[in-house]
């Protein structure tokens, strides 16, 4: 039940990836291209004045926006002002939309994938740390390998058309989401996750000196929760009944990299958040 922030340059098929995912699991897909002039109502929906032809009476009708879907691609979310960003992020957190004092509950499952372009920074509105924290994962999309790119060119410049089949239903996805939360976790695994997150905080107990030097802010409790949920999911996907510490370590990169805030010292030393997390994992 977490959302994902995808970071990658244009042309890496982020839209195709998400659209294909929505098709194979038979979910409603919606794409929102974020621009500087996008308004909150363009995402959540708006009220229109509607006239009843038979009675002549007029009333307001709520027209649902693109947020009323199961999988939403928020393309270049950092290109729109904070007010519009907040409209989507509120829906992500609360799973409902409020318009004109009326609450509209979103369909489940509800999953947002937001994208950011790491190259172009002019005219963008970076997401604040508090809003970045609402994304479970931060995934970096790399360029394809040479062989992968050859296969891509062959398939996309011919008449080849992939045939997609539904493999899951809404009900099955919700069942598996609940199943993950029923997976037992040993106390030492939870303690490891909490200790790992705690050591990202510059003022925490037992924080390494390099964290104090390179980070101005660490991850909050939500990171510990997502480390355990991610570890649970990884365990059952691999046919195991319970996660171990290695599962938590595998989740550390995508869960923590957008939750730690580097300072000027890290920038001066050319150290990224990913490198800091890797160094931290080597100390625990």
Where are the regions a protein language model picked out?
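Conserved beta-strand position immediately N-terminal to the Walker
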Residues: 4, 72, 110
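Walker B catalytic acidic pair
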Residues: 8, 75-76, 87
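P-loop (Walker A) phosphate-binding loop of NTP-binding proteins
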Residues: 9, 43, 115
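Canonical AAA+ ATPase core
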Residues: 50-55, 80, 84, 92-182, ...
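Conserved AAA+ ATPase small/helical "lid" subdomain
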Residues: 163-224
């Amino acid at each position: 039940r977490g959302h994902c922030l995808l970071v990658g340059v244009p042309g890496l098929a982020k839209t195709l990836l998400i659209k294909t995912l929505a098709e194979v699991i038979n979910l409603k897909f919606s794409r929102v291209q974020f621009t500087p002039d996008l308004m909150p109502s363009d995402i959540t929906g708006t009220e229109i004045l509607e006239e009843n032809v038979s009675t002549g009476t007029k009333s307001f009708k709520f027209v649902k926006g693109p947020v009323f879907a199961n999988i939403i691609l928020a393309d270049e979310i950092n290109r729109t002002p904070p007010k519009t960003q907040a409209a989507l992020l509120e829906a992500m957190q609360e799973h409902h939309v409020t318009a004109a004092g009326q609450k509209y509950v979103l369909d489940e499952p509800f999953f947002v994938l937001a994208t950011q372009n790491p190259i172009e920074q002019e005219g963008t509105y970076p997401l604040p740390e508090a809003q970045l924290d609402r994304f479970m994962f931060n995934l970096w999309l790399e360029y394809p390998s040479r062989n992968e790119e050859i296969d891509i060119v062959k398939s996309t410049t011919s008449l080849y058309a992939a045939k997609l089949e539904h493999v899951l239903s809404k009900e099955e996805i919700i069942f598996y989401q609940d199943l993950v939360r029923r997976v037992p976790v040993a106390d030492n695994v939870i303690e490891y996750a909490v200790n790992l997150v705690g050591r990202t905080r510059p003022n925490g107990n037992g924080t390494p000196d390099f964290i104090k030097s390179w980070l101005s802010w660490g991850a909050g409790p939500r990171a510990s929760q997502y480390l355990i949920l991610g570890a649970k999911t990884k365990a059952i996907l691999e046919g195991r009944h319970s996660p171990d510490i290695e599962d938590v370590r595998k989740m550390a990169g995508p869960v923590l990299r957008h939750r730690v805030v580097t300072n000027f010292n890290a920038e001066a030393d050319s150290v990224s958040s990913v490198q800091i997390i890797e160094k931290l994992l080597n100390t625990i």
